């Protein structure tokens, strides 16, 4: 039975060059609908990084039309962004080269979210990031 205190939206994303932009637009509209515009910049950036990582590392050769699934959940003072992809490979944070121009997306996620992690699934994995929702930020 669904928990009425949990609000959720999900979107299936295609593995194409517009994937990250589509994810940001979906996130922006969802945050606007939920009255959480104050979180938009950080959340959109993190969603973009998680989706780009999934696209780059998990689905480069898949033929599935919607291999990436983005879920946004609001519950108990938190907003959680979760990206499901078909790969079972764990995400890797690159702490080696602080000046690298690429490969630093999870460092950004780590810096902006209050928590993040990943879980293996029967059909791949989910990588998630959580943000604190200020009670004044939502309706």
What residues fall within each predicted segment?
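Conserved beta-strand-loop-beta-strand hairpin that lines the nucleotide-binding pocket
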Residues: 1-10, 55-139
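STAS-typified acidic loop motif
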Residues: 10-22
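Conserved short strand/loop->alpha-helix "switch" segment adjacent to the catalytic nucleotide/phosphoryl-transfer site
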Residues: 24-48
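Histidine-centered phosphotransfer motif of kinases
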Residues: 42-60
């Amino acid at each position: 039975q669904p928990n009425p205190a949990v609000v959720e939206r999900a979107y299936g994303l295609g593995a194409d060059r517009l994937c990250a932009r589509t994810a940001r637009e979906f996130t922006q509209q969802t945050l606007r609908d939920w009255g959480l515009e104050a979180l938009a910049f950080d959340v959109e950036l993190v969603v973009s990084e998680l989706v780009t990582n999934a696209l780059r590392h998990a689905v480069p050769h898949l033929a599935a039309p919607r291999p990436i699934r983005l879920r946004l959940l609001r519950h108990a003072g938190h907003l959680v962004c979760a990206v499901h992809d078909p790969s079972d490979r764990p995400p890797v944070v690159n702490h080696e080269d602080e000046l690298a121009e690429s490969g630093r997306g999870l460092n950004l996620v780590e810096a902006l979210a209050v928590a993040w992690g990943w879980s293996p699934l029967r059909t791949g994995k989910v990588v998630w990031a959580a943000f604190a929702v200020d009670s004044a930020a939502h309706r």
